[in-house]
Amino acid sequence: MPKRFLAPVTEQIYTLNLGPQHPSTHGVLRVLLDLDGEFIVKADPVIGYGHRGHEKMGENRLFKQFLPNTSRLDYLSGFLFNHGYVLAVEKLAGIPVPPRAQFIRTICSEFNRIASHLLWFGTYVMDLGGFTPFLYAFDDRERILDILDWVTGSRLTYSYCRFGGVDRDIDTRFTDMARDFIKRLRSRWPDYHNLVTRNIIFIHRTRGVGVITPEQARQFGVTGPNLRACGIAFDTRKAEPYEVYDQFDFEIPVGSDGDALDRYRVRFEEMEQSLRIIEQALDRLPGGPFMNDSVPTRLKPPKGEVYFAFESARGQAAYYLVSDGTPSPYRCHIRVPSFGNLHVLTEVLRGTLVADAISILGSVDLVIPEIDR
């Protein structure tokens, strides 16, 4: 070929588009990678493909009408965001909640947390080449969805919480299903450990890979299991207890190295801690009403503002609501954990191999729709 048709090679850096769709993420993520051979020299995440305008919708709807949106921010832990929004509005309006409703919310929230972690576990291991654990995890997750479906009527987007309580009460079948599942999942731990935790290939793919230092975590606002894997024992349920979490005995799993393996171990141990919370809540479940019937249908909180933080499956999330005394919020802002968890990767991916990028992205457990919202 004549030389005039050949572009001169002036540098060794070239750009690779990872995405905008990739199995290691939930949703549409695009990462621009500048590569020097097999090594990443720069990573630039591009977000916004899934923007739906949830915050603006929240400001143009009644407080109650925004409830279905909250389950669709992070659709893998929709109950947790639904729960957090209701708690924020109740704090803003000064609404008391019956103890039974608080316990029911907590039980369902922890089931939703386990379901989210199981989906992450199955898909992450499959990204690294392990197909069998994926089937095991989804089988167990399916049973949680059946439990939540029994009481909420939905398997993914729940909208079960109400201002002042919950939509309907639980029955003995729910508690029996919950206790049976606790026994079943605990009997599965040896299988998961044998297939994954002690798998030498999995260990080599994750140990020392994608290290997040405590300084980087603080700088980028990393929260949740990714923060605790760095050795920082911060969990909103312990640091700023809400609902009835201060009545339960549970531990905060932490790592030491901040690598992908520690992030895996922290999430795995968190599932056991959630089982402990559910067990204690079932044993102490009080009687009485499940709903405060004095809450008006057309709620008008007094003028004021509230910032309410809670622990979602991916870290600390929060609602900032401003009321001007009307049935709709003047301002509705949502803090999501995946935003900080994503952008710390601009530092973490630098200097790593392209082959490790998938392992690192998957270990952080991103849900892109909650970032774009």
Swiss-Prot record:
Localization in the cell: Cell inner membrane
Membrane protein topology class: Peripheral membrane protein
Pfam families on file: Complex1_49kDa
Database matches in InterPro entries: NADH_Q_OxRdtase_suD, NDH1_su_D/H, NiFe-Hase_large
Family matches, as Gene3D superfamilies: Cytochrome-c3 Hydrogenase, chain B
Enzyme class of the recorded protein, top EC level: translocase
Keywords carried by this UniProt record: Cell inner membrane, Cell membrane, Membrane, NAD, Quinone, Translocase, Transport, Ubiquinone
EC number: 7.1.1.-
GO CC annotations on file: plasma membrane
Catalytic activity, as annotated: a quinone + NADH + 5 H(+)(in) = a quinol + NAD(+) + 4 H(+)(out)
One of the record's GO molecular function terms: NAD binding
Family: Belongs to the complex I 49 kDa subunit family.
NCBIfam families the UniProt entry points to: PRK06075.1
Function field: NDH-1 shuttles electrons from NADH, via FMN and iron-sulfur (Fe-S) centers, to quinones in the respiratory chain. The immediate electron acceptor for the enzyme in this species is believed to be ubiquinone. Couples the redox reaction to proton translocation (for every two electrons transferred, four hydrogen ions are translocated across the cytoplasmic membrane), and thus conserves the redox energy in a proton gradient.
Subunit and partners: NDH-1 is composed of 14 different subunits. Subunits NuoB, C, D, E, F, and G constitute the peripheral sector of the complex.
Protein name (database record): NADH-quinone oxidoreductase subunit D
Name of the gene encoding the protein in the UniProt record: nuoD
